[in-house]
Amino acid sequence: MNLETLRQERRKWLTWKNIVPYQEAIKALPEYDDVEVSLGDVVDIQIADLSHKDAEQIRETALLMKPWRKGPFRINDLFIDSEWQSQIKYNLLEPHFDLKGKVVGDIGCNNGYYLFRMLSQKPEKLIGFDPSAIYYSQFRFLEHFIKSDIVYELLGVEHVEFYEHKFDTLFCLGVLYHRSDPVAMLKSLFKGLNKGGELILDTFMIDGEGEMCLTPRDRYSKIPNIYFVPTVNALKNWCLRAGFESVEVLEIMKTDLNEQRKTEWIDTQSLEDFLDPDDPEKTVEGYPAPKRVYIKAIKKA
């Protein structure tokens, strides 16, 4: 697969009618020399001596790019209160990985929140994959101030195995249930890892000891493209069949209204609207409410 040809084709996405305003707004932003970035729960960008005019321009640019799914971010006094409190997931996972000096990929990286957080561990390379011109634009907006060495590819999980180099650690958070062939996806990730490499993944799950999965008829939690929601044992089997040597369950956690909620930065429905109003243990379709399993799968050294 010729990824460079694909890159050139996908750069044309940035000329789409709905995306051009984002690109123009980013280009119009002033350059700032004195910027301090803190990579905590809130990715905090502080620009010295920011004028009221510039602050307003930054605010209007951020508002233009709604919805903001992942975050939160702060730019001086502007707080981007994203739909997801992404620090909850990151802080849950961080004790389970060491990225120093490693080549790291984040599949389905959205606007780069996790990538920015990972900078503090000083990996050798950080590469994000997400075939979304909107999320890429949000990343470029933030990167205008942060100026990191992160590479953002408008590519998907199916391209990882063909990438120019392999990875020591791959993150794939909230992607697997969107794929109609989860084992094929896991095989692609497996091929993209170096020997001894690790995959850190989360996905929706259902309770039970059996090796089975829920297959929604149409939608799950109002999401149309959810194909398989496995038990933990079924997920382990998928990973082993994809070639991984071992699978460790890091955490199981129900998604709650603190982690995912509607804010002024999304203008759409959120988790509260996806659950049965009479029984929050179920989705509006009658399925078990969203619960996630977090795993680490290891490729044999």
From Swiss-Prot:
Note the coiled coil stretches, chain numbering: none
**Protein EC:** 2.5.1.-
Name the residues that bind carboxy-S-adenosyl-L-methionine: K70, W84, K89, G108, D130, P131, S132, V157, E158, Y177, R292
What's the superkingdom here? Bacteria
List the GO molecular function terms: transferase activity, transferring alkyl or aryl (other than methyl) groups
Write down the InterPro entries for this protein, in alphabetical order: CmoB, Mo5U34_MeTrfas-like, SAM-dependent_MTases_sf
What family is this protein classified in? Belongs to the class I-like SAM-binding methyltransferase superfamily. CmoB family.
The protein's job, in short, is: Catalyzes carboxymethyl transfer from carboxy-S-adenosyl-L-methionine (Cx-SAM) to 5-hydroxyuridine (ho5U) to form 5-carboxymethoxyuridine (cmo5U) at position 34 in tRNAs.
Q: How does it assemble?
A: Homotetramer.
Q: What is this protein called?
A: tRNA U34 carboxymethyltransferase
Q: Which organism is it from?
A: Sulfurovum sp. (strain NBC37-1)
